[in-house]
Amino acid sequence: MINVVGLGYIGLPTALMFAAHGVEVVGTDYNKELVDTLNEGKTTFEEDGLDELFQEAVNKGIRFSHEYQST
């Protein structure tokens, strides 16, 4: 399992890419509102291809949390 800490402009696409390639991923951010938005199936910013990558990662089981994980 990989725990990506920080789900902003760098962390979110990184977490999504790992998950889309079959790695078990938990994306963690201290911002509960941001995590809740991701858990509702919505991205938090626009970038070409991000929505498709997000959907693929969700289908592969990515999880989002505001609580830090132990790996």
Describe the predicted segments one by one.
Residues M1-T71:
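Structural/interface elements that position substrates and couple domains in central-metabolism enzymes
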